[in-house]
Structure formats: structure tokens, C-alpha cells
Amino acid sequence: MRRREFLASSLAASAMTASESPTTRAGGRTANQSTPAYYELRQYHLRRGPQVKLTDDFLREAAVPAWKRLGIGPVGVFNTMIGSDTPTVYVLIPHLSLDSVAATTARLQADAEYQSAGAAFLSVPSTDPAYVRMESALLLAFESIPRLEVPPGVAENRPRIFELRIYESHSEKAHLKKVEMFNHAEIAIFRRTGLRPVFFGRTLIGSKLPNLTYMLTFDDMAAHDKNWALFIADPEWKKLSTTPGYTDGEIVSNISNAFLTPTPYSQL
């Protein structure tokens, strides 16, 4: 291949990689989309009152638009409907690489539009903080669902709810066994019984380690209850969940969950 043709083909390949989104929709995925994404799952713990509006304004007017300019998205922003700590805002930020995770803060610092739009939040005094505490976890997507799956009806802002679940294990070996169980069989049963996944991830850095975290989406609580009942009654699930090495008693030490609702500007 001549040098000019080689350079042209290399640039085209680079452009395709750069424009690739860390998402997939119903259907197949390309070879590049099989590379697992990284997710930052952020929680803003708030006090009722001015902190709620201040944080919402910041995310809507500054953070989400800035992430979009950086090619990061779709970003999910959720309020807690049912959970142990309310009000808490959850933010799900997808990345295609660890380099993206590491570089984002510096890139936002250099974004004048972000700094201006978010000034009221970013420059609060210590005597009047924007939140009680922010927590963050870094997750690696599962092999069987390597990218975010955007729920149907997001563009039309259809009503929807989300269930965020965390499965803790007593050891790394047990944790990896539960990941294997999901990858090899359990996620397929989820899909068949109407439990629609948004993401599954192994928590690399965060609290309650070792754990895996995943998110499901439903039209409403009635659909949630109906589809979980179908899953629990499924013969394949009953067989899988009683298979030696895959029982909860062997590989899961605690399960916690929260129900979330998307903000009007959430991209999920």
C-alpha cells in the first residue's frame, strides 16, 4: 500500500474509534463495542433545601453539557425514589478508557463555559457547601454487556424508573464466581423475563468491596413487580440458583438496592 493510502486509511480508522459511543441499543454490537466500558457512579448526598436546587442546576446547566462537549455520554442523572439515604442524586458517567477517566477533571478545569455555568456550585464557601458529601465508584463493564444500554423511550422522555442493585461477596473469589454466573447465564434469563438491563459492572474502586453493581429499567413499579415475579418463577433460574458453586449462600453476602427516577435532562 502506498504511503498516502496508508495514512488515509489510518486516519479513517482513528476517526471511527474516536466517534464510538460507550452505548449500545437493542440489537447487535460491532467488534469495537465489545470492549468493556468504564463507569463512574457518583452520589451527591444532600440536605433538603437549597442544596437540592443548587446541585440540580449545576448538573443540568454545567456538568452534563460539558461532558457532552468532551464526547462523554449518555450520562444518567437520577433522583432517589426509594433508598436508605435521601435526598441523594446519582450520576452515571460512561468512559471508553481509563485515560478518559483520568483526564476528565483537568479537561473540565480548562473548559471556560463549564466554569462559568457551574460557578455557583463550584465556588461555594466552606460555610455553605453544595452537598454533604460526594461518593464515587469506578466500575468495569461485564463482558456480556460491555456498554450502556439506553432504555426505550428516552428521546420522548417516557415515564420510567430504575433499580440499582449492589451484590457484595465475602471474598474476591466468590465475587468473580457471581460475575461468571451473570455473564454465562443469569443476564440471559433477565432479558427473557423482561428485566431490562442498563449496565452491569464490577466495582474496581469504591466501598463495600468486593461487589458488582447493576441497573435495571422498568416502565413503572407494576412492571417491576411483574417481571421480577416471572424471573423468580423461571425454571432455568431455579436450576441455576441451586447449582453448587452458584448458590447465594456460597457467593453473595449482602444485596442492597435503590429505586431511582431520571431527571428531565438525564440521557438515560
What are these regions (language model features)?
Residues 22-33, 64-90, 96, 184-213, ...:
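Short, glycine- and small/hydrophobic-rich beta-strand elements in well-ordered beta-sheets
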Residues 45-55, 61-69, 74-155, 171-173, ...:
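Hydrophobic, ordered structural segments
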Residues 257, 261-267:
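Short, low-complexity, Pro/Ser/Thr/Gly-rich segments in the mature regions of secreted, periplasmic
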Residues 18-47:
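C-terminal segment of N-terminal export signals and the immediately downstream linker at the start
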Residues 37-41, 88-90, 160-164, 211-213, ...:
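Intrinsic-disorder/low-complexity, polar/charged segments enriched in Ser/Thr/Lys/Arg/Asp/Glu/Gln
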Residues 7-8, 35, 53:
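Anionic, Ser/Thr-rich low-complexity intrinsically disordered regions
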Residues 2-25:
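N-terminal export signals
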Residues 45, 49, 141-221:
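Surface-exposed interaction/gating patches
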